[in-house]
From Swiss-Prot:
This is Inactive leucine-rich repeat receptor-like serine/threonine-protein kinase At1g60630. Residues 278-652 are cytoplasmic. Glycans are attached at residues 72, 104, 120, 185, 205, 225. The protein kinase domain is predicted to be catalytically inactive. Keywords: ATP-binding, Cell membrane, Glycoprotein, Leucine-rich repeat, Membrane, Nucleotide-binding, Phosphoprotein, Receptor, Repeat, Signal, Transmembrane, Transmembrane helix. Belongs to the protein kinase superfamily. Ser/Thr protein kinase family. SUPFAM superfamilies: L domain-like, Protein kinase-like (PK-like). The chain crosses the membrane at residues 257-277.
Length: 652
């Protein structure tokens, strides 16, 4: 009888002769299978490993995507076998019963996405992962990992998703500050200390940090102080008992600290009394309040552009509550939704403010009320509208618009010289930040075609709903006016506000905003139209496909060659060159839609309802293609955002 080792030798030798995949990959796969598949759950048969279950993609004769999910695998990972697969881009063992520690994976130099969630892995965080400089996605949730989360994660400059929830990690959170970081969850561990107030970690709300031992920080509305015993240094170590010979020094230090602390408390109390007196005095003097408004207005003119953000947090709103004649303005809620949280103008005036952006129509703020409730407030630039009744009617029309792909307008405030619009707050950011990150240069990553189709369908449905109202348009469609909802659906904001803009204003429009507009509407004195919205939709679709913002008139520049330009950009920017060949039909469908929308003549553009039908047809064909190819694996970096359902996305 031939031994099992002899069979393995002959099998590997046969693959070396006839397989298009390099023999080392074949040997590595078979060795890996022997360590994690004792029940033979993986039916690897045939002569071409690229057709084996779980081998989702091969590039130039090398395995680049291995996805072995929910196959009842057990045992532990073989580091030697895995490191031989050095061309892997995606590796997933999600939803099995694998155990043990993670071996050294420093040989996977091309790895971009690692999914080890929902297993029984234990041990410390695999330090070798921090040397994989191309790594973007790390998902280790729902295992038994322990120890500290290493600060060496800062070396992963492309880190996009970091999920380690439901483990036993302890210590502090490292000060991650990658501009690319968009998804983060460390909840349900044993972490403690100060959550680092980095720009990257400040994006995430309390749900990313809940159920830990003793975390504190602005993100979870739990301030750090001496009484909690929590220090503000991420690398802080437990206190070491002081020897008896040094007890006197310690006592002197305690006494000195108490005296200094007492003096500091007295100074703070005095300062607080002064501030309260000044605030009371300012309320009684109208001119002092008006001077603050003027100062804020001047500041706005020198601030960043509409995609920029301000770090001037926790400032109080200084808008007026009364008009010059003394008539009190009113905060009016729109609609009759009893589930909407109600608040007063006084609550709004006491809210702390963070500038989210400044645009041609006004400034947008994140307002955090004393109760902790968060809203978005848009302060319109041209506060003195000559026809207030007309303004009120228009806003009430917008307030009646209710659709899953529209950011709801909840309330408005009007006085003679002040107009505010109140929207729901969307913490997941904008489509602009999704594509371009923190860059303002307008150059970002093209999204995968599945993501483009999902976003396009969301936006098309929102626009069709708006266009059902005769004469109503969005009027200012661009990626910064698309927000990501709680389920990462794309939602339109700032819709219908272009009619409120003063057409004779000398305020300049940025180039990026200008070239989203149809040629016939670039003269701001001309009213926006529904065909112009279709044109803007086409430009936005080109931005999704190329990652390039419209700082130039791309349609005029490339004309009939725009499809060639899009393909060239995607071939240059996408890291897997075979993507275009694998999805040519899908890309062509998107290009057909985009080029139809950006027709120079308005009468040649399809109606938004026709555009929606084209997008839905393309998505249906794409879904059929995905089903037939059995490719349900974790996607590229952009797929993890839009193409996955919310429950899958947040639970990986």
């Amino acid at each position: 009888m031939i031994s099992s080792s002899s069979c393995m030798f002959f099998l590997v030798f046969a693959f070396f002769l006839i397989s298009p995949v390099r023999s080392s990959d074949v040997e590595a796969l078979l060795s890996l299978k022997s360590s994690i598949d004792p029940s033979n759950s993986i039916p690897w048969r045939g002569t071409d490993p690229c057709n084996w279950e779980g081998v989702k993609k091969c590039m130039k004769g090398r395995v680049s995507k291995l996805v072995l999910e929910n196959l009842n695998l057990s045992g532990s990972l073989n580091g030697k076998s895995l490191n031989q697969l050095d061309q892997l881009r995606v590796l997933s063992f999600k939803g099995n019963s694998l155990s043990g520690s993670i071996p050294n994976l420093s040989g996977l130099v091309n790895l971009k996405s690692l999914y080890l969630n929902d297993n029984n892995f234990s041990g410390e965080f695999p330090e070798s992962l921090t040397s994989l400089h191309r790594l973007k996605t790390v998902v280790l949730s729902r295992n038994r990992f322990s120890g500290k989360i290493p600060s060496s994660l800062l070396r992963l400059s492309r880190l996009y998703t970091f999920y380690v929830q439901d483990n036993l990690f302890s210590g502090s959170i490292p000060p991650l500050n990658q501009a690319t970081l968009r998804f983060f969850n460390v909840s349900n561990n044993q972490l403690s200390g100060h959550i680092p107030p980095t720009q990257a970690l400040n994006r995430f709300n309390e749900s990313s940090f809940t159920d830990n031992i003793a975390l504190c920080g602005d993100q979870i509305q739990n301030s750090c102080n001496d009484t909690t015993g929590i220090t503000s240094t991420p690398s802080a170590k437990p206190a070491i008992p002081v020897a008896k010979t040094r007890s006197r020094t310690k006592l002197i230090g305690i006494i000195s600290g108490s005296i200094c602390g007492g003096i500091l408390i007295l100074l703070l109390t005095f300062l607080l009394i002064c501030l309260l007196w000044r605030r009371k005095r300012s309320k009684s003097k109208r001119e002092e309040r008006r001077s603050k408004r003027v100062a804020e207005s001047k500041e706005a003119k020198t601030a960043e552009t509409e995609e920029g953000t301000s770090d001037q947090k926790n400032k109080r709103f200084s808008w007026e509550k009364e008009s010059e004649e003394g008539s009190v303005g009113t905060l009016v809620f729109l609609g009759r939704d009893i589930t909407v949280v109600r608040y007063t103008m006084d609550d709004l005036l006491k809210a702390s403010a963070e500038t989210l952006g400044r645009g041609t129509l006004g400034s947008t703020y994140k307002a955090v009320m004393e109760s902790g409730f968060i809203i978005t407030v848009k302060r319109l630039k041209d506060a003195g509208f000559p026809r207030m009744d007309e303004f009120k009617r228009h806003i009430e029309i917008l307030g009646r618009l209710k659709h899953p792909n529209l950011v709801p307008l909840r309330a408005y405030f009007q006085a003679k010289e002040e107009c505010l619009l109140v929207y729901d707050y969307f913490p997941n950011g904008s489509l602009f930040s999704l594509i371009h990150g923190s860059k303002v240069s307008g150059s970002g990553k093209p999204l995968h075609w599945t993501s483009c189709l999902k976003i396009a369908e969301d936006l098309a449905m929102g626009l069709v709903y708006i266009h059902q109202n005769p004469g109503l348009t969005h009027g200012n469609l661009k990626s910064s006016n698309v927000l990501l909802g709680p389920d990462f659906e794309s939602c339109l904001t700032d819709y219908g506000l272009s009619d409120l803009h003063d057409p004779y204003s000398i305020e300049d429009t940025s180039a990026a905003s200008l070239f989203y507009k149809a040629p016939e509407c670039r003269d701001l004195r001309k009213a926006s139209t529904q065909p112009a919205d279709v044109y803007s939709f086409g430009v936005l679709l080109l931005e999704l496909l190329t990652g390039r913002t419209s700082f130039k008139d791309l349609v005029h520049k490339y004309g009939s060659d725009i499809s060639t330009w899009v393909r060239a950009v995607r071939e240059e920017e996408t890291e897997v060159s075979e993507e275009l060949n694998a999805s040519e039909e899908k890309l062509q469908a998107l290009l057909t839609i985009a080029t139809a929308c950006v027709a120079v003549k308005p009468e040649n553009r399809p109606a938004m309802r026709e555009v929606l039908k084209m997008v839905k047809d393309a998505r249906a064909e794409a879904a059929l293609f995905s089903f037939n190819s059995s490719d349900h694996s974790p996607g590229r970096w952009s797929d993890t955002i839009q193409s996955l359902p919310r429950e899958d996305h947040m639970s990986i």
